């Protein structure tokens, strides 16, 4: 599979980004087993049905099928945000959601819990669905809103299951059920006594019946990994769609996206600067994209001064 994916890179680079992944793979791999694995890997990683995806997903690392080590954050991804916040102290206001951002030529007003904050500039780094319906004035221009609407919206879930007996590191993909699972080391260097699973795309989540609980997924995991001693009673299912502050997983440029959409999506609206993984172009869907978008927004604010 890795060799097949490598062999496709030149053709994918030359192909139009509007060509869908299924159309491209049918032309080059037909209905081979390798094509099915690539479909599954792309759909899971992008958390979207493969017919929404551009053949250019074969060029990125998010849907890679190449064997390589994967870095993890000791203590969880939230540690990055907490570490970045340390130097800001009490200037960060937690549990204080903004309800409106109104800007004019000279300043910006942010409404927060019945009070207002006046600023020279604002960076909005909120999930795409919230941004699209936020009370923002001036509003999002039509061309920018259209580019946002063309983005792929990912839907994903995770299942974490404790292990009754230790297991070595592993990573296994279930092609037909569209999920993969892994065991991995933590910051101590020891393998966690937990198997983690991730599934992406609405069809996959429907097939695993995540809205009714973890039972269907647990059965699929048992069938895929009979070598693991699962403690099903401790299983934890988490779904991005059910988080009101997220409403979906992450986004990316898909087959419907047009050249230049990434610049349009991240363009500032007067004194309001837009950040977040959804503005990061080829880095969309990744924490790396979120971080890069923050640096880009900071540069815009400084340039504005």
Where are the language model's segments positioned?
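Central helical "cap/lid" subdomain
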Residues: 96-97, 102-105, 111-169
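Active-site/ligand-binding neighborhood in enzyme catalytic cores
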Residues: 2-97, 107, 125, 129, ...
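Short glycine/proline- and charge-enriched loop/turn segments
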Residues: 60-66, 138-145, 250-254
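Short catalytic/ligand-binding loop motif for oxyanion handling, primarily in non-cytosolic enzymes
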Residues: 45-50, 80, 102, 130-134, ...
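Short, glycine/charged-enriched secondary-structure capping and boundary segments
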Residues: 88, 107-108, 132, 136-140, ...
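Conserved flavin/dinucleotide-binding core of flavoenzymes
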Residues: 55, 107, 155, 174-305
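A structural signal for well-ordered alpha-helical scaffolds and beta->alpha junctions
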Residues: 14-22, 35, 74-81, 153-157, ...
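Active-site rim elements
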Residues: 7-15, 66-74, 145-150, 202-211, ...
